[in-house]
Each structure stands twice: as structure tokens, then as C-alpha cells.
């Protein structure tokens, strides 16, 4: 599958190229050139899958030109095994026709863990294949920083610099961002806000 810029002026790229590039050269966002089609029967057959198996089925068409099914399965399984509920995202019934999807069972208790924990593994996989290293600089005033840090803290291919506004994040968020151990993680408090 190829990915194209929303502004239409950048070359199309593969999944791994997009993963390691970020924004398109024309300032746009990369989106799939086409969307995979799943039959009703196929979707119905997924209804009893666990979270990791479902994620694998949905993600595979988007990445299969760069990542084998078995590689993706390993990354997805390892990612969601670190969540603290066996269902990963349990659907809890509160009452008649009242349900809540719990999205706080990841390592940082933020819904962003669902994407950012897997993203770290996908990036590491691409960097290892290409024998490359990457520097990521991010700025956050919330839980994105801790989820991104947690997703990349074990990588020996990524150096991550996370900026957060000094005394403008909650104490829990500050501690999550500044106490995670990783030689590749650099957290910087910046006076002011952004």
C-alpha cells in the first residue's frame, strides 16, 4: 500500500517511509492511497477475536508491503501483553444499553497508549532493517509525552527529546514524563507554554 499527502504535492511513500518521515514534504499529512475492503463475513468472523488479534487483522493490509504478517503479529502481541487487563480494552456494561469502553489499562493509563506503544515497536523494526537511528523531538502539555516515552524507552535506535511547560502539567503527568528510565529519553521543562 502506498501513502499520499493530503496536499497532493509530495511523492507517494511506503508505510515504513511514512513512519520514519512524519509530515509530507509539502506540509500535508500522509494517508493511505486506497483503503482495504473487508467483507461482512470477514468482519463478522472477527467478533470473537482478542484485542491483539483484531489489531493484527485490521493493520496488516496497511503495512504488509513492508512488514510480514508474523513480524506484525509479534509486535502487536508484545505491545498489548504489557497492558494490565487481559481484554486490553474491556467493554463494561453499566446498565441496560449502557456500556463503557475502558481505555486506561496501558502502561501510562492514557488512551494514547493504544497507538504509541505499538508505534515505538514499528519504528524500531523499520530502523533496525535500515540500520538507521532517529531523533524525535516532541512537545506536550499532557499525557502524550509519557505515552510516547513509554513506547520508545527501550529503543537503542531512537533518541527522544520531550519538552513540556514548566509547572504547567499535572504532578502525575510531570512524574510520568520525568521518572521513566531510559538512556535514550531526554525530558526538558520549558518556561512558558505552547
Where are these regions (language model features)?
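PLP-dependent amino-acid enzyme catalytic core
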Residues: 1-194
Amino acid at each position: 500500500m502506498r501513502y499520499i499527502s493530503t496536499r497532493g504535492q509530495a511523492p507517494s511513500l511506503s508505510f515504513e517511509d511514512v513512519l520514519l518521515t512524519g509530515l509530507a514534504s509539502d506540509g500535508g499529512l500522509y494517508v493511505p492511497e486506497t483503503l482495504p475492503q473487508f467483507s461482512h463475513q470477514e468482519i463478522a468472523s472477527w467478533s470473537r477475536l482478542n484485542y491483539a488479534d483484531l489489531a493484527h487483522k485490521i493493520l496488516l493490509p496497511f503495512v504488509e508491503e513492508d512488514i510480514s504478517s508474523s513480524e506484525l503479529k509479534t509486535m502487536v502481541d508484545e505491545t498489548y501483553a504489557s497492558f494490565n487487563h487481559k481484554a486490553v480494552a474491556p467493554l463494561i456494561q453499566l446498565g441496560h444499553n449502557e456500556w463503557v469502553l475502558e481505555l486506561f489499562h496501558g502502561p501510562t493509563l492514557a488512551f494514547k497508549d493504544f497507538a504509541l506503544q505499538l508505534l515505538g515497536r514499528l519504528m524500531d523494526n523499520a530502523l533496525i532493517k535500515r540500520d538507521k537511528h532517529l531523533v524525535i523531538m516532541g512537545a506536550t502539555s499532557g499525557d502524550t509525552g509519557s505515552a510516547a516515552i513509554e513506547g520508545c524507552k527501550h529503543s537503542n535506535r531512537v533518541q527522544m527529546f520531550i519538552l513540556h511547560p514548566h509547572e504547567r502539567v499535572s504532578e502525575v503527568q510531570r512524574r510520568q514524563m520525568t521518572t521513566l528510565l531510559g538512556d535514550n529519553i531526554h525530558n526538558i521543562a520549558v518556561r512558558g507554554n505552547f
